[in-house]
Amino acid sequence: METRNIKRCEYEIGDVLSRVDGLVILLAKYRDRFFSFRQYANEDLYLADLAKYKRIQRAGINVPKLITHDREKKVLIFERFEEKKALDVLSVEDLKEIYFKQLFNIYRFCRFSKIEIDYMPENYILKGTTLYYIGEEIIDANPKRNLENYGLRYWIYSKEAADHLREKGFAIDAKRIISEEEANKRIVLLSVTYW
């Protein structure tokens, strides 16, 4: 097994979790704990992701903790959660109210910080009673991409959510798909309740 030494800690490197332009995310282990080991091809991408993490964290959004970073080796190491993503849960059952309460808390932090993040449910993990954002996107505030106008529809079993689940390779339960009218009512009710 390959090992990598980052700031006097020796990480056992496992499977490749993701590979995108200029970035490889690997599963890493140190003292019986698992981490996301992010290796960057260039310093600009490394610095951009580090700045993105700091900006999201300053906004008050729960994200996996940055355990360590090494600019020379262009590595960021984050804590790793084994819990299911919100999209995985939605594929088998409706999301519980705790998800929506936490999601609107995140949305509130985004609004106050004048930023938007990716509100699609595959970018969130519920650990205990805390929802964590595990997505990559952070942009300046954009009313067309906010939770109410863009993302919330994918958190309930609407036609859009079913199409999205199908695109991601999940089986669809046609009996669970709610009508457009019911989806709109649910979105308004969630917004009134938690905003």
Where in the sequence are the language-model features?
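A short, low-complexity linker immediately N-terminal to eukaryotic Hanks-type protein kinase catalytic domains
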Residues: 1-13
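ATP-binding glycine-rich loop module of kinase domains
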Residues: 10-50
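Conserved hydrophobic "DFG−1" position in protein kinase catalytic cores
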Residues: 27, 39, 68, 77-80, ...
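Protein kinase-like catalytic core scaffold
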Residues: 35, 62, 76, 132-134
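Structural motif at the C-terminus of the N-lobe alphaC helix and the adjacent alphaC-beta4 loop
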Residues: 51-62
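Conserved structural core of kinase catalytic domains
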Residues: 61-102
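C-lobe/activation-segment region of protein kinase-like
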Residues: 112-115, 127-195
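Hydrophobic residue at the +6 position relative to the catalytic HRD Asp in the kinase catalytic loop
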Residues: 119-124
